[in-house]
Amino acid sequence: MVRLTVMVLGLIAAVSGLVTTADAETPVEWFTLGARVHGGFGAFIPVGIRIGLDALQRLNARPREVTVVYYDSDKAPCACIADGVAIATVASPGQRTLQIAAETAPAGAMAVVIIRKKQSGEAVKYTVADSWLPKLAEWNRTLDTRGRYDAAMKAEGLFDMAQMK
């Protein structure tokens, strides 16, 4: 009986872990959330979602377990990427877990995002080159919402990522 109870508890724990990690938003849920938070779902929002999801995976973190510092540039239309990162990581200015830096992104970058795991201090840095601006603008002009999402999620070389201490 004890052995059966231990096996059942182990199975429940394993399934719970699968459910938690598989509990992701669908593309339609991302569109709806992005539009609600940002006021629309242009091509920059899924760039931020992709960065945020990638960081959570690399840092082995769950939403709300990270802090975000976003460096914007004067070349980007607005800090749209930051809103995508925010909805993917559940970081927010109100929780003091998302900051838009006073300093700008370095030359050649339209955005730099540093995402740090609160518990360990481990961090990853993402740089989106300003050479992506024409392609993102084209996606906004020529693709529907789903097309923008898919293009951003599949684009090779969309950002550079570096581990930080």
Task: For every predicted segment, state its role.
Residues 23-41, 46-165:
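Non-transmembrane, aqueous-exposed alpha-helical and coiled segments at domain scale
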Residues 6, 21-22:
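N-terminal compositionally biased, intrinsically disordered segments and leader/signal-like regions
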Residues 7-17:
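Bacterial N-terminal signal peptides
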